Every structure is written in C-alpha cells, then in structure tokens.
Amino acid sequence: EQQIRLSEIPAPEFGEAERARALAAIFEAAGLKVRTDETGNVIGESLGSQPGVILFVAHLDTVFPAGTDVTVKRDGNHLIGPGISDNAAGLAALASLARALSESRVKTKKTIALAGDVGEEGEGNLRGIRALVDGYGSRLANVIAVDGPSIDYITTQGIASRRFEVTITGPGGHSWSDFGEPNPITAMARGIVKFSAIRIPANPRSSFNFGVIEGGTSVNSIPARASVKVDLRSEDESELARLEKALRDAMMAGVNEELRSSRSPDAGDDYTQLNQFHMQMEFLPIGSRPAGKLPNDSPLLATIRSVDSYLGNRARLERSSTDANIPLSLGIPAVAVGGGGRGGGSHTLEEWYDPAARDQGLKRLYLVALALAGLDR
C-alpha cells in the first residue's frame, strides 16, 4: 500500500517536492535523522559510531510529464500505473529498509544513509546524486542505487551518455504564398534520416534515440522553428564523441540540403533558384553522464554476492545508466540493484509491478546494509 501511495504522488522532472515530503515523513516515523538538502533530496540517516557512510539511494522522479494520470490499478497480483516499478518500487524498498533498521534496533559502525534523490530521469542530469556525493565527500564508503524491482541483476558498469537539443530556425511563412522557402521541420527530418543511417557498433555497445520533436504553429504555416531532443549512449567515451560529431554533421547536412532544395516564391517553375533566406542551427547540450565501472574484485560486489549466496539468489552483472554512474566515475564503489518483486513496461503508461518474492529483495538490502556498515557490538 505504501508503494501505491508513493506512486500516486506525481513526480515529473523538476517536480519531485511533494513525493519527497511523503518519503521524509516515512523516514521520520522510522526514527531516522531526516533532512532535505538544497537540491531537493530527502535524506534519512541511521547514525553509526565511527566515520564512513553507506548510502542507499532511490530516485524520486519519473519520466511522465505533469498532468499524467498516475492512478494505480489492480489486475490480479499486478499493480499497473506509470512509475509503479520505476521507481516507486525502489522508494518502497527504502521505506521498508528504514523500518527494518528501526525495529531491529541494530547499531552499526558506519552511518547508513537512505536518500530519495531528484533528477535521475530525463534532463535531470543526475543532479540529485551529484549533490549527495558532493555533500558526503570523503565520508562516502559505498553507494547502492535501488532502481526498479528486479533482484536478478547487479549493475556494476555505468554507461556514458550525452543529450542534446538541436534547434533549427528559418524565416517561416504561409504554406501557399511562401511555398519554397526553407522549412526547419523538413531540414530536421533530413538530418535525422542521415544520422539514422550511420553505423552503430555492436562493440562497444552504443545507442541513440530521437525522443522529443517540437515545431510549427499550424498545418498551413511554414514553421519558423523546429527542435529535437536526442539521447546518445555508449560503453566507450571515444565512441560517444564520434556519435556526437556524426550527429552535428548529419543535422547540418540536413540544413544545407534543405537550403539547396528551396526556391524563391517568385521563381515560377524555376525550382533551381535558391532562396536568399538562411537557416540557423543551435546544438545545445542538455545532459552528460560519465561512465564508470566497479572492479570485479571489489569488496562491495563480494558482499552482495555473499548475501545472494546466503539467500539462494542468482544475479548477473549488468551495465546501465543509473545514479551509480556518478560515484563510479569518481572511483567510489557503487552498484545499482532492484528492491524486490517483478516489473515491466518501464516508461510506459502500462507499467506494472508484481510483489511476488518481494521479501527476498528487502532481506537482501537489509543484510547488505548491515554487512557494509558493520555491527557495533
């Protein structure tokens, strides 16, 4: 029920405050020392007797815009609703961990910090975890990002990503009387097609996504502006740089091709006459996530493996783009794991969650927390 309540509090990008307040109340009820930092992260601490902090973090935000119906529906054992798995499952796991620490009255050597952070999704650019890592500084021993439900993976490698907003502007005009003037939407379409045709290597694994396109004012107006938001990802920073250059070149080629094909409205049947107007392109970075990798012989990974062995859980090593990217890029041991249960349809309106075997995930987090923090006898 707590997961449903959290999921039904809207938390779009840059709009996580109400959900943060709800999580803070849960932490306070569990007896944690609670604060909210300037970035909007809510932090609850179970204080240790010695220096060092073990940070468990789950992101508060979702990919869904303000106004999305976030009501959770039931279908048998399934809970269905935007964000119910990503990341209400992670937040509910933190809430359960807070209660377990309180009810067990356990004392640890290192401080166990639980944080609901902002800005993990979309254009948040991991601003929440950046602030947490900066705030704890050298005290930070380990970071465990709790992202989604599944416990059959351990994310030990952070995929690098760069995100851009490409904007093309032109003179605009009437679809009939100004026909032939360069069209920013057409120029953008040309560029997208050109970039989509480039070679994307299987190794290092890389990807791209044109996620949001905007432009135009009416069906009978030549638009004066068009923009697209693009996500580039790769396991390798040099390949990511190659993709960025290829994107710039393709979009500019689309602009130049559109200019060459345009003509003056007064040119009659002379379609070879170039338009004297010009177009401009702006290439704006809107996000950058660094890569990082946890060594296979890391004590953090060994601890999780030991707990998994005790619980009879088998988990594969994975790579992804999560809150763990930031500490990994700085050499701080970090992983991303699930909070328990099963889920699917992430980032869609039909996202679902099944609490089957959820207890296994919660036990896993609790035992990992105690093993890393150390019992204070």
How would you name each of these model-derived features?
Residues 2-5, 9-52:
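A non-catalytic alpha/beta surface segment that caps or lines the substrate-entry region
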Residues 45-87:
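Catalytic-core environment of secreted peptidases
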Residues 60-75, 140, 155-167, 306:
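Acidic-glycine-rich active-site phosphate/pyrophosphate-binding loop
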Residues 3, 8, 184-377:
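Metal-dependent amide/peptide-bond hydrolase catalytic core
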Residues 57-58, 115-117, 143-147, 167-169, ...:
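Short beta-strand segments
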Residues 78, 83, 87-159, 201, ...:
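Acidic/histidine-rich catalytic neighborhood of metal-dependent amide-processing enzymes
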